[in-house]
Amino acid sequence: MGRHERIAELSDLVTPEGGRALEIADLATGYGRTARAILATAPGPVRIHAVDTGPIIDDDLLHDPRVRPVLADLDDPLPFADAVLDRVTSVNVAEHLADARAHVADCYRVLRPGGLLVLMHSDWDTTLVSSDDDGLTRRLVDKFVATVPKWVQRADGFMGRKLLGLATAAPFEIVTVDTWADCHLRFDEDSVAWKVARGVLAAAADDAELAPRATEWVQTLRRYADEGRFLFAVTDVAVVLRRPAAPAA
């Protein structure tokens, strides 16, 4: 089971009373991998509001009547009325926000009583990758974690371990706290390992001594993958929070 399938499972996709569609906001949906896992897992009807800053979701999901693309800046309040959603998934969002606690509080606002927020983040400082040079790998990972890439405004390589502290931003109930580290044996473009390697190259680019060593390091990863010796993992942290149910009348 991969990351997105785990998130779908943690979302507890129970059909609401009366059989209406489960209303879900998938924040920073990207290509739609979490949305796809939710559609495959849900036992009943769902409506996914796929929220991102740009329309990069896969074409088949873009045209799926169960998916509603929403363009929004996640530093702004979420584009939903109060208490209209059953589930919110926030995956690798918090590190890029000006105020992660405000984000969690706003997720609380849009959830119905009894609704769930699945707050998940990779903790990039836990990156494990096979290589020929342990010392260089440690140095490059540290550089990657400490550097904000030029293509984003903010980053925090330690965000995974900070998620539980964000839960106090609103009067949520903590349902579960989980960690896992998926094992990746391939170094394909757009894989998590490939994205980390790209981040390493960007972080080292301005260091005349380190940049060529980083390039050689990535070439080593490709060689390891070709030889069947490549291994990559990073710890993911997932905190499931519930907006308390409304008191009985």
Residue ranges, per PLM feature:
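A short SAM/SAH-binding and catalytic strip from SAM-dependent methyltransferases
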Residues: 86-99
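A short glycine-rich, Lys/Arg-flanked "PGG" loop and its adjoining helix->strand segment in the class I
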Residues: 101-113
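Conserved catalytic/acceptor-binding region of the Class I
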Residues: 118-187
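Core SAM-dependent methyltransferase catalytic element
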Residues: 170-173, 236-249
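C-terminal helical/coil "lid" or tail adjacent to the Rossmann-like core of SAM-dependent
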Residues: 176-231
